[in-house]
Amino acid sequence: MKHLSGLDNLFLAVEHGNQLMQVAALGIYDPSTAPGGELRFKSILNFFESRMKQTPVFRRRLIAVPWGLDRPYWIDDTDVDVEYHVRHIALPQPGDWRQLMIQVARLHSRSLDKSKPLWEAYIIEGLDHVPGIVPGSFALYIK
């Protein structure tokens, strides 16, 4: 068990209702540059699963102290379901930049489940009509 840092505790304390204190990143990837020229969702799941074993932050979840007498603690969750945390979705048609931004905004507006490790990743396909993006590319949105 480890106490939340002051910054982590601050983010948690000021989060209320629609004011979510989440940090996120969005990357766009061309799977043709992967070894073999393709990348399957199962390979991405395997990658995250291997990183979960090496990186404690992917396994930590919150435990509150009764009556709020102290800052919450991080505990190591040994039973993290990678398929809960890494999700596979596709953009609705036409699959353009606007649709990608709408989807990312929707995902970002959802609170993380505080009973699980505090992260989610989304593989977003269907970017074929985003100008300047190679057809068949996908986005990785992680928060």
PLM regions with names:
Residues 1-143:
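Non-catalytic N-terminal regions of enzymes
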